[in-house]
Amino acid sequence: MDRDFPIVVQHVSKTYSNSRVGAVPTLEDINLSVRRGEFVCLLGSSGCGKSTLLNIMAGLDTPDSGQVLRHGLPVTHPGTERTVVFQEFALFPWLNVLSNVMFGLRKTKLPREEKERIAREKLAAVGLAYYEKAQVHELSGGMKQRVAIARALAPHPEILLMDEPFSALDAMTRESLYGDMQTLCSRQGVTVVFVTHNVREAVCLGDRVVLLSPNPGRICREWTIDLPRPRHINQAVVTEHAAVITECLRRESAAQLTPTL
């Protein structure tokens, strides 16, 4: 069981304190098992706790109750087997592209020559083989995110956690990255948990879409996306699946706004 599901969320709840309104429940009794090699999209409106859940999976935050297990062992801190790609590119402007990717290997004991080889391999995989000496300020937004993805993949993680990584990019760049992500994840065999509020993006990328309702965040629906790959954001079947999920999202939002008498 543990080998089939590298990351398992068990009864996770989280509450934050707000100086104006007091305790704010963010997550409530979240249970989720992610199968090895699966691409799971966490979908929901702003404030439903998607990013909080991802941070807990990454070991960057802790739950108030419940736990996250990796192969049966509690996740209590970050690790190179679980890497994160954020919405912000989080690159170091004083390092060139190659050095930024090599930073992802800083905790390994590999010799520098091997780190450089791996970094170049990952840059080639994201289409940036000829930009290793470029400075961060010379890159477009899409290129910066490709560098961030290459850095996250450099240590050969088992689990890749992605927090709305494409939301700040233009539509054409996003569409290109959708195809790249499907290819990269398939080749490397990585398990992906991907946070988004974009329904078509979730259908295009995900093997499974998990919908969180807000206030507090709870898992309210799941869909298995059994469509052949590669998928394209404008495919009719993607649009059709997205329409079904969007309608469910609308109903969930309406239920949240309906006063209880």
Question: Residue ranges of each PLM-predicted region?
Answer:
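Helix-to-loop junction immediately C-terminal to a conserved catalytic motif
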Residues: A58
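Catalytic Walker B motif of ABC-type/P-loop ATPase nucleotide-binding domains
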Residues: L160-D163
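A short, flexible loop at the N-terminus of ABC-type nucleotide-binding domains that lies
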Residues: D2-P6, T15-D29
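The feature captures the beta-strand-to-loop junction immediately N-terminal to the Walker
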Residues: L43-S45
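Conserved signature/switch motifs of ABC ATPase nucleotide-binding domains
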Residues: A134-H137, P155
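Conserved ABC ATPase "signature" region
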Residues: M102, E113-Y131, T183
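Short helical segment in ABC ATPase nucleotide-binding domains corresponding to the A-loop/adjacent helical element
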Residues: L98-R106, E116, T224
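Conserved ABC transporter NBD signature motif
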Residues: G66-P78
